[in-house]
């Protein structure tokens, strides 16, 4: 059990990034209603935060860059918890380092880019010479299940770690609803 074992102390921040440069004629870049960076990637970037910090976030905030068609080409989702925070960065026309960082009071976990495909993660401490490398085995198929399985491996949980619990799915759906309201407000003043 790595993340919640106390090895990195108390988890205070989870940051996940998933970006790619989609072509202009792709669905992600051409469909203002159902394309865009948030709807395309947030189910992946929010998953580590929800799995590690839980569903009881206190506030959600969106920073959104739109193109001239009203497609969100880069969106940051900030979640605030009582004693932690999370940032999910999503992009279809902005490229960034696609890594996952889980910051704690004694160290941090780094899953290098592309973290959603990685087969390893590292634990870093204040002493830069102290780095632990983990290469757990994965089972199951499907992108979301692999990410969830990866997070469960960081947590040290092997049984059914790939399953998204009902309350986690509901929390992520609530964030999606909040995004759709914010997008509508920013684009249409509603």
List PLM regions with ranges:
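Predominantly a Rossmann-like dinucleotide-binding segment in NAD(P)-dependent oxidoreductases
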Residues: 1-60
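Mobile, glycine-enriched helix-loop/loop "lid" segments at the mouths of ligand-binding/catalytic clefts
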Residues: 13-17, 113, 120, 125
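A general secondary-structure junction signal
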Residues: 15-18, 64-66, 168
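Generic recognition of short, well-ordered alpha-helical interface segments
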Residues: 29, 40-47, 72, 142-145, ...
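Contiguous beta-strand/loop segments that form the cofactor/metal-binding neighborhood of enzyme cores
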Residues: 45-120, 147-160
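Surface-exposed loop/edge segments in extracytoplasmic proteins
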Residues: 128-133
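Active-site loop of classical SDR/Rossmann-like NAD(P)-dependent oxidoreductases
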Residues: 134-148, 164
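C-terminal helix-rich "cap/oligomerization" subdomain common to oxidoreductases
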Residues: 149-190
